[in-house]
Amino acid sequence: MRKLFTSIYLWGIVIISFCSHTTNAQQLLNPRLQPQFVNQLPVPGVINGLSGGTFNINIRQFDQWLGLVDPITKQHLNTTVWGYNGSYPGPTIVAKKDIPISVYWHNNLVNGSNQPLPHLLPIDRSIHWAFGHDPNWQSYGVPVVTHVHGGHTESASDGLPDQWFTPDFAMKGPGFIKGDAQPFYYHNDQEAATIWYHDHALGVTRLNVYAGLAGYYIITDQNEMNLQAANNLPAAPYDLGLAIQDRMFTSSGQLYYPSTSEEEEEEEVPYPSILPEMFGDFILVNGMTWPVLDVEPRQYRFRVLNGSDSRFYNLFFSSGEQFIQIGSDQGLLPSPFTTNQMLIAPGERKDIIIDFSNPALWGQTIILKNNAKTPYPKGSAPDPLTTGRIMAFRINKPLDESYPLTTLPATLRPPIVPLQTELAPRKLILFEAEDEYGRLMPILGTVDDGILGFRDPVTENPAMNSTEIWEMYNETMDA
């Protein structure tokens, strides 16, 4: 053990070996024996909220083909997943600035007899989670609550971890306010941006999202619509989301989430046990393993989301093609900029343009690759044959001249006025401590107070409409 910060003792990062295809007596699919760049990129359906309205979105369990095959028979292997409105990823919600929408999120994780379904993945009940140590927890069903990540949302509709609920609202978290009698309300009072929605239930967020509960939430505004109308930005069908996620699968094609580490197998820790980080050995984009997209010789807009648990991606093209970044988490950049590679962290979004119009690309297949280490930035390099590959693009479709070509402008938005503040910066710290079982535990704190738990009194209470500077100090081994 090494003392790193104010009496905090840190473990070395737990790194799980995924070279073996047997984990805890569970046979796993070998990613090297699965097809790549054969199956077309799926495009989720759309919920059109441009004119406002109230929508019902159902969370259900179903089987979906994610591109997996039996390595011997080559027969398709379907995977049981969860999704919104029967889709993984969920449908893309499209809204417009200052036009609110309301959503009833229905927890329909029940069987044909309307009985609650068990979770698809092992739950560690030793951590702070929805049902605590209640011995009857399995009879209640799976807790869920949806959070719009990046949205400017009222607290009652924010999908806070304690706002969870089970099927038919039989059980509700202590923070539950809306969902049954009242829908979640989204003001959409922010500029055009690529944000996303995902489950956020206490203690099982990682598992519920891994099971499939995520989707895009796109906000547009008049500035962006003007750019599209002037053919300065690609619009549908040349405006697509790319949600990148890593997963592991059993030999029968079912989702697998590690529930103990090699280090913990010889120690007295609960089983199943939470892990501080999880890195899958399959890469999926929009719910398909290593897909391909056939494209025309023109500009495409891709809204890239890193929907993985812990994995960073440093993206680059096998052909050396460049990315033109036009937006980030919260909206359009002041002007486009060009780069040969693009780093994207879990939960982050990057809005990019790829120009396939170069005549030298016609008839070619180019591969989107990844070279980010796991854990980032000091861990192991990805397998160049699996996790080092994301998807492929085939430049083989004839140009559809009914859609005009686009030309990026020099500026994308009005200038951003720098914010000023005379308030002292708030200084917060990211720690890695140990829990009562000796497991690595990411946790927050402040420079003045050190480590703070979930139930500790609030320390950061900025005034409404104030401007502050928050300084984040990373004391973890990944820094």
Walk through the language-model features, giving the residues of each.
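Bacterial N-terminal signal peptides that target proteins for export
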Residues: 1-10
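Bacterial N-terminal signal peptides
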Residues: 9-18
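N-terminal signal peptide c-region/cleavage motif recognized by signal peptidases
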Residues: 20-22
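N-terminal, post-signal-peptide metal-ligating segments of extracellular/periplasmic oxidoreductases
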Residues: 25-148, 152-172, 181, 266-302, ...
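Short Pro-Gly-centered flexible turn/kink motifs
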Residues: 101-103, 175-183, 345-354
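Short, acidic/polar linear motifs in exposed loop/turn regions
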Residues: 109, 205, 308-310, 476-478
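Histidine- and aromatic-rich segments of cupredoxin/plastocyanin-like copper-binding domains
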Residues: 136, 153-170, 244, 248-252, ...
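A conserved hydrophobic secondary-structure block that centers on an alpha-helix together
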Residues: 171-208
